[in-house]
C-alpha cells in the first residue's frame, strides 16, 4: 500500500498545475479524480475509456434534466418529489461526468498513455454532454411553460406555445454553440497558454491549427473514419481559438522569432507573463464552474430558461471582458519585446 506522502506526490504529479484550481476543484474534484485514475491505472484502463465513460454519463443525464420538475411534477400524477429527485440525479451524473473528465488527463500523466486522439476526445467531452442536455432542457421548457406565461399574462394556446418553443430553441442554439461552446473554447486555450508561462506546468500542450493540419495530412490511407472526423473538427476548433486571439498569436510569433521557442524565453519574462495571466484565469468566466453551478441552481428552482439567459448575457459579457483583458496584456508585452 502506498504511503500517504507518496500518494500525495503522485497526486501533484498527475496535475498540470495546482495554482489555477479553486479549493473545491483541487481538493474535491481533482483529488477524487486522482484516486479514480490511480485505481484505473492499476487495472490498466486506457484514459480514452475514461473519457468515453464521461461522455456517456454526461449525455445520459439529459433524460433526468428533461424530466425533473418540482413545480409541474413528473408523470400523469404530477409527482413533485420524483421531479425533484430527477433533478438531483441529473446534477449528480453531471458532477461525476466532470470528475471523470478530469480523471482521464490525470490517468494519462500517471500512465504515460497520451495520444492525439485522447486530446481531441477530451476537448470534445463537454460538447457531447451539453448538446443533448441543452436540447433536453429546451424540450422541458416547451412542455412546461405555464408559469412563465402566467408571469407575462400570455394565453397558453397551441400557437403561443409553438412560437415560444421556437424562440427557446433559437436561444438554446445560441447559448449552446456561441455561449457554452465559444466560452469553453476560449477558456481551454487560455488555460493551455497560461501553463506555458508556469514553471509548475506538467505535460502542457498548446496545439496549433497548422500542426494539426500537418498531422491530418500525414494520416495513413487506412486511418479510421472517426479519427479523420475528430481531427478535422479539432483543426477547426484550434483555428477558431487562434482567430479569437489575434494579439496573443502575435505575441507567440514574436517569442518564437526572438528566442527560437516559447520555452526559451528568459525566466523574468516568463514570470511577467505568468503574473499577467493568472488573475485572468482566476476570473473563470469561460470555465465549467459557473456554468455548472448556474445550471444546478436554475433547474432546481424550475426555471431552466434562466440558464440560457445567464450563459448568453452574464457569462457572455464576462468572456468578452476576459478576451479584452488578455489581448491587452499580450499587446503590451509584444510592444516591449
Predicted regions span which residues?
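A short amphipathic helical element positioned immediately N-terminal to and/or at the very start
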Residues: 29-43
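Select subsegments of transmembrane alpha-helices in polytopic membrane proteins
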Residues: 47-55, 122-130, 280-289
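Alpha-helical transmembrane segments
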Residues: 138, 154-194, 200
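Structural signal for membrane-spanning alpha-helices in multi-pass inner-membrane proteins
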Residues: 58, 62-66, 133, 137-140, ...
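C-terminal membrane-associated helical module and adjoining short loops/tails
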Residues: 1-32, 179, 189-337
Amino acid at each position: 500500500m502506498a504511503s500517504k506522502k507518496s500518494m500525495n506526490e503522485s497526486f501533484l504529479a498527475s496535475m498540470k498545475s495546482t495554482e489555477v484550481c479553486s479549493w473545491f476543484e483541487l481538493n474535491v474534484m481533482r483529488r477524487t479524480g486522482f484516486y479514480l485514475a490511480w485505481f484505473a491505472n492499476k487495472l490498466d484502463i486506457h484514459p480514452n475509456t475514461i473519457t468515453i465513460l464521461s461522455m456517456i454519463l454526461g449525455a445520459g443525464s439529459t433524460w433526468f434534466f428533461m424530466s425533473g420538475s418540482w413545480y409541474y411534477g413528473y408523470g400523469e400524477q404530477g409527482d413533485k418529489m420524483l421531479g425533484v429527485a430527477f433533478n438531483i440525479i441529473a446534477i449528480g451524473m453531471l458532477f461525476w461526468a466532470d470528475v471523470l473528465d478530469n480523471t482521464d488527463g490525470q490517468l494519462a500523466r500517471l500512465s504515460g498513455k497520451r495520444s492525439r486522439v485522447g486530446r481531441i476526445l477530451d476537448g470534445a467531452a463537454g460538447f457531447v454532454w451539453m448538446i443533448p442536455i441543452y436540447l433536453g432542457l429546451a424540450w422541458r421548457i416547451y412542455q412546461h411553460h405555464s408559469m412563465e406565461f402566467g408571469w407575462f399574462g400570455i394565453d397558453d394556446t397551441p400557437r403561443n406555445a409553438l412560437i415560444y418553443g421556437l424562440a427557446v430553441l433559437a436561444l438554446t442554439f445560441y447559448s449552446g454553440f456561441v455561449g457554452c461552446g465559444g466560452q469553453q473554447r476560449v477558456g481551454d486555450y487560455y488555460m493551455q497558454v497560461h501553463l506555458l508561462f508556469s514553471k509548475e506546468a506538467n505535460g502542457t500542450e498548446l496545439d496549433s491549427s497548422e500542426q494539426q493540419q500537418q498531422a491530418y495530412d500525414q494520416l495513413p490511407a487506412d486511418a479510421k473514419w472517426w479519427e479523420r472526423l475528430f481531427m478535422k473538427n479539432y483543426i477547426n476548433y484550434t483555428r477558431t481559438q487562434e482567430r479569437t486571439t489575434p494579439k496573443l498569436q502575435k505575441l507567440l510569433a514574436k517569442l518564437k522569432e526572438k528566442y527560437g521557442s516559447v520555452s526559451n524565453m528568459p525566466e523574468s519574462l516568463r514570470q511577467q507573463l505568468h503574473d499577467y495571466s493568472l488573475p485572468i484565469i482566476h476570473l473563470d468566466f469561460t470555465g465549467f464552474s459557473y456554468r455548472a453551478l448556474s445550471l444546478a441552481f436554475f433547474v432546481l428552482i424550475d426555471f431552466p430558461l434562466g440558464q440560457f439567459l445567464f450563459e448568453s448575457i452574464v457569462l457572455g459579457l464576462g468572456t468578452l471582458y476576459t478576451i479584452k483583458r488578455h489581448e491587452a496584456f499580450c499587446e503590451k508585452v509584444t510592444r516591449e519585446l
